[in-house]
């Protein structure tokens, strides 16, 4: 996937989740 410039180590994907990104290997991917 495409990295969404947001990490999800301590908290889930927030802003980028609205753009269809999901957590994978502690990084939000689209």
From Swiss-Prot:
Q: Is Disulfide bond tagged as a keyword?
A: yes
Q: Does the keyword Metal-binding apply?
A: no
Q: In which tissues is it expressed?
A: Expressed in leaves, petals, petioles and roots but not in runners (at protein level).
Biological process terms in GO annotation = defense response
Give residues for the crosslink Cyclopeptide (Gly-Asn).
1-30
Disulfide bridges in this chain: 4-21, 8-23, 13-28
The UniProt entry, under PROSITE patterns, shows: CYCLOTIDE (PS51052), CYCLOTIDE_BRACELET (PS60008)
Q: How does it get modified post-translation?
A: This is a cyclic peptide.
The UniProt keywords, alphabetically, are: Disulfide bond, Knottin, Plant defense
Function (record text)? Probably participates in a plant defense mechanism.
Family under the similarity heading:
Belongs to the cyclotide family. Bracelet subfamily.
- Domain topic, free-text comment: The presence of a 'disulfide through disulfide knot' structurally defines this protein as a knottin.
- Which protein is depicted? Cycloviolacin-O1
What species is this protein from? Viola odorata (Sweet violet)
